[in-house]
Amino acid sequence: MLTHVDDKGVKMVDISKKEDVERICVAEGYIKLKPETIKLIKEQKIKKGNVLTTAQIAGILAVKKTYELIPMCHPLPITSVNVDFEVFEDKIKAICSVKTTYKTGIEMEALTGVSIALLTIWDMVKSAEKDEDGQYKTAEIFGIRVVEKIKK
């Protein structure tokens, strides 16, 4: 049975009768970059500024805006957001952990946080990643997924 569709059309599910429950979700994803770009990020030599700090802020903001971006997501009280990065030779892993005590899950918030953090990295390093024809031969976002979902 589809919970978001009835004979009148699309609707948002009524969660008013559900109890508040502590929920935690961790999502991750990767961006593949040229090793030279990773070096510039580590040395903080990217022209637009500090890549990882900017991406961290963007990821946090994205979590808080998820309900405005995804039509069937409920606005919910976010009690904690953490966006971290692991930097490898040719890629960066973004990890977004989100916590709430509410009636519905926070998977979409964690996934949105990771996605926007990775997109922000791409935006920050565009000039370093383009080849002589203006193409992105190396840059790739991949592996976005929910790593862990906890409902207490």
UniProtKB/Swiss-Prot annotation:
It is an enzyme of class 4 (lyase). GO terms for biological process: Mo-molybdopterin cofactor biosynthetic process. Keywords: Lyase, Molybdenum cofactor biosynthesis. Its EC number is 4.6.1.17. This is Probable cyclic pyranopterin monophosphate synthase. It comes from Methanocaldococcus jannaschii (strain ATCC 43067 / DSM 2661 / JAL-1 / JCM 10045 / NBRC 100440). The gene is moaC. It comes from the Archaea. Homohexamer; trimer of dimers. Pathway: Cofactor biosynthesis; molybdopterin biosynthesis. Catalyzes the conversion of (8S)-3',8-cyclo-7,8-dihydroguanosine 5'-triphosphate to cyclic pyranopterin monophosphate (cPMP). It catalyses: (8S)-3',8-cyclo-7,8-dihydroguanosine 5'-triphosphate = cyclic pyranopterin phosphate + diphosphate. The active site is at D123. Substrate binds at M72, C73, H74, M108, E109. InterPro entries: Mo_CF_biosynth-C_arc, MoaC, MoaC_sf, MoCo_biosynth_MoaA/MoaC, Mopterin_CF_biosynth-C_dom. Belongs to the MoaC family.
